[in-house]
A protein has these predicted regions:
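Long amphipathic alpha-helical segments
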Residues: 1-75
Length: 76
């Protein structure tokens, strides 16, 4: 079973590999793609955005997170 919190964490950490593998597992388990987007991917981008606003993350972190999200979205 896909651990969907890993998907949010993958986005926050900018881990393309983890984002893709978790998304693949979720799709194999027939989890609704819209749920993945709204409940996990966007949540991860919101978190990294909050960290950026607080000065705890920088532009490279945002770019890595965006790349991880793009990788997950390509599967959907």
């Amino acid at each position: 079973m896909a651990k969907l919190s890993d998907l949010t964490n993958a986005i926050v950490k900018g881990s393309l590999e983890l984002a893709v593998s978790t998304t693949q597992e979720a799709l194999q388990e027939n989890i609704d793609p819209q749920t993945l987007i709204s409940d996990y991917l966007i949540k991860g981008m919101e978190e990294i955005g909050t960290q950026f606003e607080a000065g705890k993350a920088y532009v490279p972190n945002l770019l890595m997170s965006a790349r991880a999200m793009k990788g997950a979205l390509e599967l959907l």
